């Protein structure tokens, strides 16, 4: 097995091993340290000696021994943990994948969205603290403190390492999906910095979504989220020029879209829509599939897109949904209709000064022939975003309408 294949295998197994240890020993931070030591040992031994027949069992055994050694050397907790420390590490490790339970734990409701995201990437994604810090453009020390506080909050909450029942499980799963959605969005369109994409985050979100889908293939929203990610990610190569400038959807070279991802995503959409209920991720995936089905921008089925946004707006009201519906409405009934719908967002404090609202209004004003209004709103939008790639694009649009 090549070094890259071993690296990929370890990345896949790490959350499973961590889940197994947390279930057995119940201490998140100590288990994570022990798993990292076991992974480090594997990166040294496996290339030289070969991958063991049961690599997951090997990692669980080594990590358990490291954790027990750590417990035995901790004199302050010797009495409390003596029973655990004298346990014999089992030769046969149960073949149970606790990744989903670990994900639910990382997305504990007592944590903020930022902490849930960071802890998920660290514990389940296997990214280092430095990698996560770079992805979100914060100092490594800040990210390390955020992750540490998240672990302490989970410990203080006394959460058990088990799947919640009934309604609580559904609610926690929705939080997991939201966190994966946030990770993907930050990777697909970075909210700040010089790059439009952060491919590592987008790829990691898709990998984790696949993992959840493998364990919950019948869940329509899990399927819908994975489909949405695949259909959106399929456009990545066409979204920027060679110089890194943003290319809007209607101007993209669709021959650059990844047809394999589109085909997979479209099949997942069909599967998810056949279920008994519709959720927001399924509807967003259906919208993405409608765009992917059009060979050119002009062939887009805008009435269908608008109808889907209407349903989405009813079941999951959100100003960004209304914003996107305004674009679809402008394509079906004209820019004035879109502008009228946009005006309903002016009273929403969440959208005050938002660059997306300003840029869409600029685009629709440009379509009506109001170049002065379009120029003003493009400039305001450029000043309102922290993304340098988006700033460049919006400034170029402003220059174009003024020329």
Where are the model-predicted features located?
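Amphipathic helix-loop-helix modules that constitute alpha-helical solenoid scaffolds
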Residues: 78-131, 138-310
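Amphipathic, Lys/Arg- and hydrophobic-enriched alpha-helical face
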Residues: 9-29, 41-45, 104, 189-192, ...
